[in-house]
Every structure is written in structure tokens, then in C-alpha cells.
Amino acid sequence: MTDYKFEGWLGHDASSAEGKMVWGEFEPKKWTEEDVDIQVSHCGICGSDLHTLKSGWFPTPYPCCVGHEIVGKAVRVGQNVKNIKVGDRVGVGAQARSCLQDDCLQCSNGQENYCNRGMVSTYGSVYPGDEGKSYGGYADYNRTNGRFVVKIPDGLSSESAAPMLCGGITVFAPLRKNGCGPGKTVGIVGVGGLGHYGILFAKALGADKVVGISRKASKKGDVLSLGADAYIATDDDKDWATENGRTLDLIVSTVSSPKMPLTEYLGLLKVGGTLIQVGAPDGGELPPINAFTLLASEYKIGGSGIGSPSDIAEMLQLAADKKIESWVETRPLKEANQAILDMEAGKARFRYVLVNEKHA
């Protein structure tokens, strides 16, 4: 038994995405000696939270407490957890467990985020057997398997680290794994919560040139302040596609729209260039692509989903070493309902972080 309660903002149906979450107690997964209990101090608001609250990607097993950009203090650590001790400042991203079997090619090779045997998300998942459900970080406490709990390096603030645990890693992982670095010109499509990390990390990884790509010219000042070398406004620059054709080695697209000009984005790539899609619209449908668009320029298209625990640790250390700061606005946890509405309305520059004032 613990001397603390698991309480948080619960969505009971799809209307909870309209700012109708209700504070209440929930039962975390059954404790095992592989788990860590975290006293939550900070939790970023991610677009995934809104998709899940409204059952946009899949039917949500309500009640659901969202939030998978969690930072806090480890207050209970299972005997089999070797990397964390009580009192450590720790974080949890979008994944709470995988199958963790030695014969799983993904789990045994640092690709736990692609395990297809036993993937458990930080919230909205049902554990196998009778272990219960996963509940996220819009809460006082969180319980997660210790393999997916990472230490937050000294020198990196909790409010800056929290949104990196999903938003940051979603773009850091494909940048690093697709050759972002010296000699490369990189484009980031969509400069919001995810895209602003794309610019920060592309520069930190040493890309020669980083180009921000979004719809409106009004974002240019912010994008250049983040460190981008150039900016393309697709709504306001009439000839953007032809003027910038075949100039980029790598594009990471954070846009979650089935109507995005995907063919035109591909045209920005040099011959043999790569586009990695990380944004996922409700339903998952992307615009169609003509085969000749790919054949004529040897384009490669791929995808990337979050990152492994080792990827996250590497990203956090880079952020600490390079003194990367997230562009965030903090909000009290008690204002979570209004904060998700403001997030949906696009008011965040560029991420909201909920602060649990009882534990901060």
C-alpha cells in the first residue's frame, strides 16, 4: 500500500476534449517490482492527448487520464529496477511498456518503440492479463515500467524537458537516424509544437542549413529566432515550390493534415532525398502520391514513431549539453481543461506544460 492517491483529470467520453475532463481518483496498473511510481511535477500537453480524449485515432477505453510528457520525482522503485533510485528526477514519454522478451527483435535491439507484441502506451492502453489500464500525467502520480523511465540530466529544467519526452523525441529520432548533420540541408514542415523541436535539434546536430516550412509568413520571425536559416511560407509565397525545388537533403514533416501538399513537399528534395512523416491525422490518411513523382527523382518516403528509451536519454543529454530550451508556456494543472482548449485553438508558442503546484 502507498500513502498517496492516484488522482488526475479524467476524460469519461469524447466530450472531454471540449474542456470537460473531471478530476477524480483512478486505479493504476497493479504494482510489480519492475515499476516506478512518479510524483508528477510537470506534464506537457501533446496533440496526442486531444486525439485520444476524442477517440480520434482509435476507441479510447474511458475513463482516461492523458499526458505522456511527464517529469517528476521517483517515490517508489521496484526491486528489479536498476537505473532509477528513489528521489531521482525522472521522465516518461509516450510508451509505458513493451513485451521486453529476449526473442523480440525490436526489444532486444533498442527499438522498444516498434515492438508489436506487447506495446503499452503511457495512457489509454489496457495491460495484458489483469494488470489494469495505463493512466497518464495530468495527475498527481504515475506508475510506469522502469525500463521506460529516464533520468533528467542536470542543467535541463523540468518544464523544458517535459515536452521533449514526446514532442522532442518524435523529431529528434528521425533527424538523427536519417543523417541530419554537417553537410546536410534539412527542412522542417510545420513549425508548431513538434516543428520547433525539429529546428532546434537539426541545428544542434550540426546541419549546414535548416529551413522552416509553414503556411503563414507571420511565423517567420519566430522560426528564424529558433535558429532556422531560411523560411518558406506556403500560403503566402506563390512560387515557393518552384523557387525552392531540389534544395533539401531531408525533410521531416510534422503536419497532421490529409490535405497537405505532399507532392510539392517532395519536390523540395534533391535527387535521392528523404521525407519522413511524423504527423498523423485522425484516420491516418495522407494525400495520394503519383508513382512518377517518386521514380523521377529517386525520392524515399518513410515514417517514424516516438523513440526508444535510449533515444530519449541521448536527446536529453544533447539538450543539456547544447543548452537547448523548449519554447513553452506553463499553466497550472488545475487549468488543464482551458489549456487543452487553447492548445486546440493553436495558441501555444509552442508547447504548454502543466505544472502540478503541489509537487513543483
Predicted regions, residues:
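Short, glycine/polar-rich helix-capping loops at beta-to-alpha or helix-loop-helix junctions
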Residues: 215-222, 284-291, 311-312
